[in-house]
Amino acid sequence: MKYISTRGAAPVLDFEATMLTGLARDGGLYLPDHVPPMTQAEIAGLAGQSYEEQAYLVMRPFICGAFSDDEFRSLISKAYSGFGHPARAPMKQLAPNHFLLELFHGPTLAFKDFAMQLIGQLFQAALARSGARVTVVGATSGDTGSAAIEAFRGLENVDVFILFPHGRVSDVQRRQMTTPDNSNVHALAIDGDFDTCQALVKDMFNDFAFRDAVQLAGVNSINWARVLAQVVYYFSSAVTLGAPHRPVSFTVPTGNFGDVFAGYIARQMGLPIEKLVIATNQNDILHRALSSGGYLTDGVKPSISPSMDIQVSSNFERALFDAYGRDGAAVAQLMDELKQGGGFQISQGALESLRDIFTSGRASEEETSATIARLAAATGEVLCPHSAVGVHVAEAHLSATPMITLATAHPAKFPDAVEAATGARPRLPARMADLFERDERVTRLPNELSAIQELIRERRGA
């Protein structure tokens, strides 16, 4: 298997190079040149296996021999050994045909740990073989940054620089990024919003002289390995409910489209997913795009679900690539229109292709808070605001097919929003009880590419 860019003009790579590269040289995102199918028997055979074994069986066809079978199994085992639940991704029933998939039992209490903990292991193994040193740069709306720092802190051959929007993440999210004292970790508070941070990271990747000089690597969901790791829990949850003999649907709270795109890949592999429901907050560009066909950016509105406060959903480009028949030139044209004019119109054929698979909904601030309060009172289940967005949207799409809503973060990561809705402040797990007593290390920077690049040059390897 080889990996190709969504814009059609970058080198074709193998899995390891794709993982270490992140963003393609033509500005596109890498995808496998084909999606290997799983047979019904293979999918059924996942039932009853450990999460680690399911991960091995689902991901193995994509890694192109980059790791031996034994090494890959070992790296997966190490990646998930620090999770706080033996099932890794346990499921709870909310209503007769509605289930909640808890993805917040990892080290930083968010779904990003499923991918980031594995990527940390894969990077370490690959770099140990080559003797290379890389500079990991990422943008975060909150959870990606803390998950990346937790996965890479203390590694000898990796420097980590995480850009987050100053004043636009929760206190818990910020402290998870700013309190690790490892010398290879650098938290950068940027004046702007998440889209500002994401644009700066993409600009660094497109500055080839800088990219090569510091050996830049990316761990945002532009990195294919991130998406691949998230495919697994779609399979693990679906087989629990009877797949492949019984179809399921998923509702996914999403801003950057990476998590729901992992569900799309699972469907491409043969998992019987009836519908993938995109749940957005008031920053609803994905909902508007599917509804009208117009992908038109607007100003980011701060919300109680800040990890979804995004207008430029990077991974949507991957879905567009398939919807346009894998026409890289057409996708490149759309992305140029987005950069130059702030939006584009999706062709009717591509829009129909997307609507065959995806549907969408949005939750207002009031609806999000009301969902947190209602579920806590009715079931005792306390949701984070992002998960509440998912539940609210899922409830409008329930049918005879079981619906699985992804619970993306622990409620204690967003205590103010949860307390405002329920009157009770959620507690952090014991291992994080002293988070607010730890010293912070953070550098605040303006929205200036040159200033950020200069800091990275100075600090990497220091």
Residue map of PLM features:
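PLP-dependent amino-acid enzyme catalytic core
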Residues: M1-A462
